[in-house]
Amino acid sequence: KSHFGNNSVIAIYITSSRYQNEKKPYADKDSFLLSLMELASWDWRNTRILVEHCDAYTKENPNPQKGFLSLSDEINAINQTNDKCGSNIGIVINWGRSVIEHRNVDGPLKHIKHAAQNNVLGGLMFSGTTANNHNLYGAWSDRHMTPATFSDYKYFEPESLMSYQNIKNTLDVCDFSSLDCLGIKLLAMPEESSIEKRIGINRDTMYLLDQAMAELYKA
């Protein structure tokens, strides 16, 4: 704080939790609302609370990776909290988790539009997934797969659904200049990957995001 003042921490990430599927209906929207109300009562200064949406249990996603609350339930709880407490809690859409929930690359676009229409879109997190098992990550897994092969960059996965074009399409449906955060969440595979690779996948993906945003700004 002595160096950055009250802007030291831009946002705090939370999730709605807990796991639910057809047999385990544990996620509770009323408990989540109470938790948000309590969090909103604390003095966060200029730090914003952001709820990262994780894949919810749906008919398309009967065995979810996370299985937390639906986006609609999260948005309703956020809006109730903001209205009652005068807070500014928002939503972060995780690209991979929205793809997993919908089982297609239109999932993130739908979630972004839903959050934006309710004035709670606070950030985007790019984390990949894949539809097949021809890789070390696994089909529809929440293992933070790197983007698909792009240009001459070194660290990419050919089977990833998170292609350059899909990243551009995602950025294009929102005013990303108004977001509190735009991030990446990636995992190097195999588990014994070198430090060089772990750094490289993050570096190359940031280059990719920079290029996508530059092209969109030109347009």
Predicted regions and their residues:
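Active-site acidic/histidine proton-transfer and metal-coordination neighborhood
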Residues: K1-N88, N202-D204
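Short, flexible loop/turn elements at secondary-structure junctions
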Residues: I14-R18, H53-D55, W95-R97, G128, ...
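A residue-identity detector for tryptophan
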Residues: W42-W44, W95, W140
